[in-house]
Amino acid sequence: MRSKSVVVLDYGSGNLWSVQRALQRVGAAVEVTADSAAGAAADGLLVPGVGAFEACMAGLRKIAGERTIAERIVAGRPVLGVCVGMQILFARGVEFGVETTGCRQWPGVVTRLDAPVVPHMGWNVVDSASGSALFKGLDAGVRFYFVHSYAAQRWEGSSKALLTWATHQVPFLAAVEEGPLVATQFHPEKSGDAGATLLSNWLGEL
């Protein structure tokens, strides 16, 4: 049986090579590229992201990545967003008083965590959604690795979406699963065995 093909979208942001290695370790055939045709053709598309929402959206638009994501979703083809790659899937992001339009796959806004200590950095427990395909086989109270100052702190989308929450003084969305579009605020590639299981689960859905 052939390995599932995954494109890690290279738009100038994200831990590209650590994501690539993590996917390869669970059996994926991985290509890191900015090429939209490759992104459209792969079994799965992973959208990484670190840094500022505005800069990530600018980089994504330079390579027509926003369109690639949208076309895959319309066609029912899997997309996984990680960290800021999750945040930019929402309609808006607000950083330092500046509002930036996101990919608008989900309604809502990404804002600075309303917590006394940011960034939120380190291991944290997640409360995974019942029936989640991403978290299949993982125990309750499983920990993942986070590095972020911003997050979606409420959900305004479909009631059919599966929502996984975490708390850093305040609750925020740690993962969302809605049809072919899934995303994690944490870094599965930095989350050891739990992250490997999650990535393997995603590959199994491709």
Swiss-Prot record:
InterPro entries: Class_I_gatase-like (IPR029062), GATASE (IPR017926), Imidazole-glycPsynth_HisH (IPR010139). Keywords: Amino-acid biosynthesis, Cytoplasm, Glutamine amidotransferase, Histidine biosynthesis, Hydrolase, Lyase. Pathway: Amino-acid biosynthesis; L-histidine biosynthesis; L-histidine from 5-phospho-alpha-D-ribose 1-diphosphate: step 5/9. GO terms for biological process: L-histidine biosynthetic process. The active site is at residues 83, 187, 189. GO terms for molecular function: glutaminase activity; imidazoleglycerol-phosphate synthase activity; lyase activity. Residues 5-206 form the Glutamine amidotransferase type-1 domain. It catalyses: 5-[(5-phospho-1-deoxy-D-ribulos-1-ylimino)methylamino]-1-(5-phospho-beta-D-ribosyl)imidazole-4-carboxamide + L-glutamine = D-erythro-1-(imidazol-4-yl)glycerol 3-phosphate + 5-amino-1-(5-phospho-beta-D-ribosyl)imidazole-4-carboxamide + L-glutamate + H(+); L-glutamine + H2O = L-glutamate + NH4(+). CDD domains: GATase1_IGP_Synthase (cd01748). Gene3D superfamilies: 3.40.50.880. It is found in: Cytoplasm. Its main location: cytoplasm. GO terms for cellular component: cytoplasm. It holds the Pfam family GATase. It comes from the Bacteria. PANTHER family: IMIDAZOLE GLYCEROL PHOSPHATE SYNTHASE SUBUNIT HISH. Heterodimer of HisH and HisF. NCBIfam families: IMP_synth_hisH. IGPS catalyzes the conversion of PRFAR and glutamine to IGP, AICAR and glutamate. The HisH subunit catalyzes the hydrolysis of glutamine to glutamate and ammonia as part of the synthesis of IGP and AICAR. The resulting ammonia molecule is channeled to the active site of HisF. This is Imidazole glycerol phosphate synthase subunit HisH. The gene is hisH.
